[in-house]
């Protein structure tokens, strides 16, 4: 029985890799019309731990970067791609705590009132950061963290994520900071993300 399951698993991986190759060569119209299929293929490929050739993965990434639409289907498929790119998630990480200690300075160089965000960065490591729980993150860095995001309201400024795992579950059109973060992940092959200070 075990041998049969391994054989079925092998066939499934081959099938899913072929589906990923097909998605990588979609025309813009096919990609737009097939977003739910793209999401399903990428979700299944992650679950089955399919390792597609780098040129296939890059071809699918390019589809997302090239195709700029703002629909729930697009962001759901984008979440599936980001999750596919991330390695398996380690269990038992505690929540990041340093993110709550980040300060925002309220002044302008000319003496007028206003909001200038601190350029100092507080760092954390090896923890879980749920972006939806914080809404605004300023001057924060995280190394080898799990970064979760479900598409809620979000403001990011002077933020660095280094060697992190990303878990996205976006089901609707996401705010600007969420879009920026998703695009950075899709275009950056290292997984190191830097969001500059916003004034």
Question: What is the role of each PLM region?
Answer:
Residues 14, 18, 37, 44, ...:
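Generic detector of low-complexity/intrinsically disordered segments
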Residues 173-199:
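Long terminal segments
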Residues 76-136:
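N-terminal domain-start segments of secreted/luminal proteins
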Residues 102, 119-127, 140, 145-152, ...:
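Solvent-exposed loop/turn tips at the surfaces of repeat/solenoid architectures
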Residues 1-97:
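Terminal non-domain segments
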């Amino acid at each position: 029985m075990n041998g049969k399951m391994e054989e079925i698993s092998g066939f499934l991986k081959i099938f899913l890799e072929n589906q990923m190759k097909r998605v990588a060569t979609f025309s813009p119209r096919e990609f737009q019309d097939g977003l739910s299929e793209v999401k399903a293929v990428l979700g299944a490929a992650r679950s089955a731990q399919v390792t597609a050739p780098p040129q296939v993965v890059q071809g699918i990434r390019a589809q997302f970067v090239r195709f700029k639409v703002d629909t729930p289907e697009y962001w759901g498929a984008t979440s599936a791609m980001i999750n596919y790119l991330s390695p398996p998630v380690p269990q038992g990480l505690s929540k990041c705590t340093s993110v709550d200690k980040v300060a925002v300075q309220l002044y302008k160089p000319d003496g007028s009132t206003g909001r200038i965000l601190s350029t100092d960065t507080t760092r954390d490591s090896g923890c879980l950061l749920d972006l939806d729980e914080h809404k605004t993150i300023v001057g924060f860095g995280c190394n080898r963290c799990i970064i979760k995001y479900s598409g809620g309201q979000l403001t990011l400024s002077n933020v660095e994520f280094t060697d992190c795992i990303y878990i996205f579950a976006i089901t609707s059109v996401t705010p600007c900071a969420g879009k920026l973060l998703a695009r950075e992940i899709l275009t950056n092959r290292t997984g190191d993300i830097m969001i500059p200070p916003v004034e």
